[in-house]
Amino acid sequence: MIAAEDMYRLGSQRSAIRELFEYGKKRAEVVGVENVYDFSLGNPTVPAPDCVNETIRELTQTLDSISLHGYTSAQGDLVTRQAIADYLNQTHGTHFTADDFYMTMGAAASLSLCFRALTTSREDEFITIAPFFPEYRVFVEAAGAKLVVVPADTKAFQIDFAALTERITPHTKGVIINSPNNPSGAVYSEETIEKLAFLLRKKANEYGTEIFILADEPYREIAYDGVEVPFVTKYYDNTLVCYSYSKSLSLPGERIGYVLVPKEVTESRMVYAAIAGAGRALGYVCAPSMFQKVLVKCMGQTGDVELYKKNRDLLYEGLTKIGYECFKPQGAFYLFVKTLEEDSDAFCENAKEEDLLIVSATGFGCPGYARISYCVDEDMIKRSFAAFERLYKRYRT
């Protein structure tokens, strides 16, 4: 074969989410876009805060082209990294410096760099908690390691600690946590994070190894009803934070984020250097320079989270009224729904017959559920209820 078989497979087969999205575009050409209820993508629909476009205008008017679009240092612009450190220190009572941050092209790049930096053997394992973002498997395996999955706690969507304990071995390099969670919308409680930190310290001491938490946090600021999202570095020293501004600033196409390597991490400068080395090896040589500058002026800003909350309440109340069993999200912008048959793939195929595009959670490691993205137009949610009711009646009458 002229091309790498594993890469060909990834490139020739879209993810289930992207496949559904493309189907929706084609279906809209047939029946009209207003008749397709596309809940497939987690693509922010709340506008970016005003500071984003205002800062872009200011930068283009005051900086010359070379200063605006030229390379930053490999680890990122110093002013940007210090601004992030200052903001987190003020918000969380931490003591980070600019040297703790490595700027990246979003959380996906951050995770990929961390997996590559930490993997030292084909026997290395990273553990994730179902339901989980399916691309974790792609990123981990591309780094040469193995992904181990802990089954979902479908009562509260926290962590099944008995199942996690069974899966920690001397080969465990890290545990990936995603809170607020895609796809469930759950937020890990402080009790959960404390219990996780205790367990990992215990197991690391037992095996004489280092076990990292990789905190995947693109939804950190999107939380509802006063729910607090614990800042994990305060609970566990060996935490690497993989952050993206895609969701908080509604900038998914601009690809800007960071890896945070606190000084409390064991051999933190070695880990940081390995992440920088992974950036070289993978070709992530410079995060977008203009948007690094934009961040400085927009630190702490978010899109209007209340609009997501309004959609959450509308969708949750509408579907539960019909009879669906749903987990009420505490954060992010996804509703996790128990499917009306055990085969969630089949259920989502049946939903397509009503032009409802929802994502089976089989790929998220949680069969029997479906993800409904509510970062969509409010009117579409309202119009979709008749289709959801028809689907429900097909199973219950």
What are the residue ranges of the model-derived segments?
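Pre-Walker A segment
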Residues: 67-68
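PLP-dependent class I/II
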Residues: 1-20, 25-63, 75, 79-82, ...
